[in-house]
Every structure is written in C-alpha cells, then in structure tokens.
C-alpha cells in the first residue's frame, strides 16, 4: 500500500537551493532514515510532507486513508495541563473510551458506567492505561500529575515522544510515523529502549537523526540528501 508519493520536489530559500527535483515513494511497512549534512533540508522536507512548509515546485500526494503523525522540535500544550491530561488529550476512539471509563468510576450513573465498559470492550482499550504508564516509565517520566509548565525542555520532549508512541498504538488505521531527531534529550538507556521499541513495532517510519547507530538498527532503507539530490 502506497502512503506518500513525491515527484520532482524543489525547495529554495532566497538564493540557496536545499534540494531539487527529488522523487520518492513511501510504502506500508517501510522504515526509512534520511541523512544529510546540517542545512541540507532534512527538517524542511519533513515539514513539507506535513503541510507546515511549501515546496517551490513538485507534488506531494498523501494517501487519504492514512494517518500521519509527527514528532518534531515544537511541542504545544495548554498552560496548567498535567502530563496525564496532555497524553490523554489524544483524539482517538480508544483514548476517548478510556477517558469515559475513568469518569464513570466516580459517577453514580449506572447507565453511563455500563456504556463506558462496553466502549472499553469495543475499542480493546483495557491495556491502554498500563501501556501508557510503561512507555512513560521507560522514558523516565514518573510523576504523571506534574504540570507540563514545570517540566524542563528535555522532559517536555520525552513526554511528547511518549504521546506520539501512544498515538501510533491507539490508531487502528494505517499510520505513518515521522520523527525528527527523536533521540535528543534521551540518555543511553532510553535510546536503547526506543531503538528496540521501533525495531519491533509494526509501523511505517520516516526518521531524521544524526545517530547513525540508531538509524542503522531501526531502519532498513537509508536515503541521503547530497548535492541537492536524494
């Protein structure tokens, strides 16, 4: 199944050409890494795929039946939000089922409780809360009631990474996971865990990283932007 088709993409900033006339396809199950020198347009290319930037010419066609999920360097959250609230703000049926089930535990409405239980069954969401805690634990995020505002930059990145991994877990439809430098702010143990997690995961992946060992372990396809070509 084809996820993304790119044809003859060119991007310039002023008089500087980042890349020109590049073409590629991403298919289901691909685990692809993009490598290049700094300033060669790796992150710009990801932003174009996500619709956050625009090419000067060329086409990007994204399969309408897939979900594209991005981990980048910009993390947005609401002021006062706890880690749990940030993670559980995901808009997906399994997460909605879990939110309703947790509300039902403090409700006197027996009909609401019964419906919440049925939702959990239908969405196969019973293991979701434990999996969420396990992923956060592996990334050394333990106080789930901590306010996002009070976290360090590195902690915020790790919480956002956890949210992304949980999102790919709960989305039942076809998902492309795009990751820009995911090992930043991770210690050796966390990098090793993430490497194993992504290697085992049945996910389609497009990855940018300077960690050559990590990308060699996780990805089976490596693309290089060199002399403005892919």
What are these regions (language model features)?
Residues 1-230:
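ABC ATP-binding cassette signature C-motif
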């Amino acid at each position: 199944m084809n996820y993304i088709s790119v044809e003859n993409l060119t991007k310039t900033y002023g008089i500087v050409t980042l890349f020109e006339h590049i073409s590629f396809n991403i298919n289901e199950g691909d685990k692809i890494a993009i490598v290049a020198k700094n300033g060669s347009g790796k992150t710009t290319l990801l932003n174009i795929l996500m619709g956050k930037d625009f090419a000067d010419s060329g086409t990007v066609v994204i399969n309408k039946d897939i979900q594209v999920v991005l981990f980048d360097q910009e993390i947005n959250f609401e002021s006062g939000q706890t880690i749990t609230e940030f993670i559980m703000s995901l808009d997906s049926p399994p997460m909605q089922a879990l939110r309703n089930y947790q509300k039902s535990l403090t409700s006197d409405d027996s009909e609401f409780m019964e419906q919440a239980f049925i939702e959990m069954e239908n969405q196969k969401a019973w293991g979701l809360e434990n999996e969420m805690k396990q992923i956060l634990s592996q990334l050394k995020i333990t106080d789930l009631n901590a306010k996002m505002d009070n976290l360090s930059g590195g902690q915020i990145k790790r919480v956002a990474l956890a949210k992304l991994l949980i999102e790919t877990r709960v989305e039942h439809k076809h998902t492309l996971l795009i990751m820009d430098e995911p090992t930043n702010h991770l210690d050796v143990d966390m990098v090793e865990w993430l490497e194993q997690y992504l290697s085992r995961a049945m996910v389609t992946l497009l990855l940018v990283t300077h960690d050559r060992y990590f990308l060699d372990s996780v990805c089976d396809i490596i693309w290089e932007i060199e002399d403005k070509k892919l």
